[in-house]
């Protein structure tokens, strides 16, 4: 099953504002792996890079300055994800989310495919603060020649 999540679009405003970006509705949902990835790109579309960065697990998060700079020319992003792979063992839940991303930048647009790997300590096993929600441990994306509507990354849990 493939779900499509479309984010920022552009609208024209007459007279005083020649153009402006329509702001995507706010989404911060850490209840499932695919919703964490959707929330990441929602934050990117809204240019809320600190929030986008917060979806990464603290020990594996990229440097915030470099992360923010990586999106300097990004105008909007569309996300599709494939079937999530999940497993639970020894008190930890692990997930792999295949994705296709269309990024529109000041230089044009490009399609990327890849995989995000996420994990969470079983919520019932967490007894000391702070609570640790599902977090992105890693993500690998590669530019693709496949059109966004048919592109999709591949994943495993390794």
Task: Please tell me what each predicted stretch does.
Residues 23-24, 28, 34-39, 49-94:
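Short solvent-exposed beta->alpha transition segments
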């Amino acid at each position: 099953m493939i779900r499509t999540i479309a984010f920022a679009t552009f609208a024209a405003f007459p007279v005083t504002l020649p153009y402006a970006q329509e702001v995507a509705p706010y989404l911060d949902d850490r209840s499932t792996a695919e919703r964490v990835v959707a929330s990441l790109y929602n934050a990117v579309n809204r240019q809320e890079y600190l929030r986008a960065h917060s979806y990464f697990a603290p020990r594996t998060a990229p440097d915030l300055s470099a992360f923010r700079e990586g999106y300097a020319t990004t105008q909007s992003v569309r996300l599709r994800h494939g079937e999530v792979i999940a497993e639970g063992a020894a008190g930890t839940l692990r997930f792999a989310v295949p994705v296709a991303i269309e990024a529109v930048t000041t230089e044009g647009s490009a399609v990327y495919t890849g995989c995000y790997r996420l994990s969470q300590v079983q919520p019932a096993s967490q007894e000391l603060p702070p609570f640790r929600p599902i977090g992105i441990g890693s993500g690998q994306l590669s530019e693709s020649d496949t059109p966004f509507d048919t592109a999709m990354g591949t994943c495993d849990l390794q």
